[in-house]
């Protein structure tokens, strides 16, 4: 991390303790021409100099997949302005009114677009700047989190980032252990394409009419996924290049990083946040992880979502500490996580190392994999998150545990499956179930934190059983009074694809559950 003490001390003195600004900010909407002549439309919000004198540090705030840069000074952008930050939003290539094609936060394309925007900021006298190096932070969720990682890995001018509900490895996000995450994959394709095609066609568009679109590669990948039912090696390689797990091997993220992740997020689950946390920590850079209730899947109505605005306050502290350089700011414990009762907890070790004991659960059974959905889903099927399987489902093994009300589960379960039987293959899904023991009818069962782990198994043979070990999905859960935890292993899912082909699966399962 760069040491710019004189400039940072002066900046801190100018901005610390300011009251919220009351005047409307200045908003500049324009575009730059990126490295390959693609127009990138941006919005630059500047605080009222009567309230906060220039120069200002700047925060780049991206947008989600299929969206466009905010043109409103409300919400957290307004909070940043009142605290003496300029804010820049932009339409990522292929979306909004920007030109080009969407390449899924490719460092060589979208990453270079952001570097061009930083060039623009570096040339402005009203942006805090030392030797052409502006004070830059980045925030935003999902696609806007991915671009923070892709930019900061290659552009040393980024001082701090706050990626929210984003990925470490898109191969795992979209095709966990070889299984297509059907609900999210198809939904993202449709939503993103609508955003790409509709945003820039107006005659009065900032950079002129633009026909946004996906890259040809991405269109082919979607078609192959639908046709094959799994991701081929070329698809996996393409997504690796757009993941910290890929480019970060030689170009690591080594800037102060506050990672925000939703415990019920079934697209980018907490395992990805743990991987990003470990990656940044390995570079010796400051890193913090906050696990909250929500994400791409909303916090369930029977959970307590906790203190409103808690992560926003932590974000502001992170920016003040590492962008403004106010060393007296306390950013708190390296890991904070919320449980379903709304309580925030602090830890000095990684999320996957918090557990103080493990409960081991064993079960054995024979399952049917029909190549189609066999689960009887309770009520309306959720297409993006895990739902319980009926105990009488022939494709499901339900295993009781000794975990009852008042117990706390925190961390990443460990799964070992010994698979025999007969058939070309099967998809196996493992989830923790919360059951109210006061009820005979299992329909109110709920999957703990709405998460399930998936595994693709090929060539099931009765003479050569396979032993497969993999991680479950991380959870942070306090079991309600009168409830008990079960484990289900199923051959079907309401949110992911089933194996295309029938099989009989002889299963011996061992699941280790992390406890406090």
Where does each model-flagged region fall?
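Short substrate-entry loop that stabilizes the transition state in hydrolases
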Residues: 51-56, 61-88, 93-99, 266-269, ...
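Catalytic histidine neighborhood in serine/cysteine hydrolases
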Residues: 280-298
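Short beta-strand/loop motif that positions the catalytic acidic residue
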Residues: 253, 259-261
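N-terminal cap/lid segment of alpha/beta-hydrolase-fold proteins
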Residues: 24-54
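Short alpha-helix in the alpha/beta-hydrolase fold that links the catalytic acid
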Residues: 269-279
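Gly/Ser-rich "nucleophile elbow"/oxyanion-hole loop immediately N-terminal to the catalytic nucleophile
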Residues: 48-55, 101-109, 116-142
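Glycine/threonine-rich phosphate-binding loop and adjacent beta-strand/alpha-helix elements that clamp
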Residues: 26-31, 282, 326-516
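Accessory cap/linker subdomain of secreted extracellular hydrolases
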Residues: 82, 111, 131, 150-252, ...
């Amino acid at each position: 991390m760069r040491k710019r003490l004189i400039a940072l001390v002066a900046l801190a003195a100018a901005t610390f303790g300011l009251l919220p600004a009351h005047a409307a900010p200045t908003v500049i909407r324009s575009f730059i021409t990126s490295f390959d002549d693609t127009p990138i439309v941006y919005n630059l919000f500047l605080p009222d100099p009567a309230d906060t004198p220039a120069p200002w540090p700047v925060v780049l705030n991206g947008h989600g997949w299929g969206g466009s840069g905010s043109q409103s000074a409300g919400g957290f952008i307004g909070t940043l302005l009142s605290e003496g930050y300029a804010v820049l939003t932009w339409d990522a290539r292929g979306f909004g009114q920007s030109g080009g094609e969407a390449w899924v936060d490719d460092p060589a394309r979208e990453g270079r677009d952001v570097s061009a925007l930083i060039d623009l900021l570096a040339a402005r006298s009203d942006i805090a700047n030392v030797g052409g190096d502006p004070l830059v932070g980045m925030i935003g969720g999902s696609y806007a989190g991915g671009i923070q990682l892709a930019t900061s890995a290659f552009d040393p001018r980024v001082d701090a980032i706050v990626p929210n509900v984003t990925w470490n490895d898109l191969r795992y996000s979209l095709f966990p252990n070889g299984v297509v995450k059907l609900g999210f994959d198809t939904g993202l394709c449709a939503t993103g394409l609508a955003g790409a095609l509709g945003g820039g066609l107006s005659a009065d568009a900032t950079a002129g009419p633009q026909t946004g679109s996906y890259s040809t590669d991405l269109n082919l990948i979607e078609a192959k996924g639908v046709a094959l039912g799994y991701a081929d090696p070329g698809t996996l390689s393409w997504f690796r290049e757009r993941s910290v797990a890929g480019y970060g091997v030689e170009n690591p993220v080594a800037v102060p990083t506050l990672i925000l992740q939703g415990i019920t997020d079934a697209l980018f689950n907490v395992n990805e946040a743990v991987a990003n946390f470990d990656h940044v920590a390995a570079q010796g850079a400051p890193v913090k992880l906050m696990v909250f209730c929500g994400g791409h899947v909303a916090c369930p109505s029977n959970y307590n979502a906790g203190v409103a605005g808690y992560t926003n306050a932590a974000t502001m502290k992170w920016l003040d500490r590492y962008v403004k350089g106010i060393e007296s700011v306390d950013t708190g414990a390296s890991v904070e996580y919320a449980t379903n009762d709304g309580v925030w907890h602090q830890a000095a070790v990684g999320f996957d190392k918090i557990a103080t004991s493990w409960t081991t659960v064993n079960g054995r059974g024979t399952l049917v994999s029909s190549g189609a959905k066999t689960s009887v889903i309770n009520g309306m099927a959720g297409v993006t998150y895990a739902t319980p399987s009926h105990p009488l489902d022939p494709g499901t093994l339900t295993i009781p545990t000794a975990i009852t009300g008042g117990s706390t589960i925190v961390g990443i379960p460990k799964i070992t499956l010994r698979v025999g039987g007969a058939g070309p293959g099967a998809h196996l899904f493992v989830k923790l179930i919360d059951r109210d023991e006061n009820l005979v009818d299992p329909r109110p069962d709920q999957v703990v934190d709405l998460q399930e782990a998936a595994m693709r198994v090929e060539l099931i043979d009765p003479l050569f059983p396979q032993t497969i070990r993999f991680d479950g999905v991380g959870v942070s859960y306090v079991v309600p009074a009168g409830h008990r935890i079960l484990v289900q292993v199923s051959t079907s899912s309401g949110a992911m694809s089933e194996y295309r082909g029938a099989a009989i699966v002889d299963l011996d399962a061992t699941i280790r559950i992390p406890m406090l």
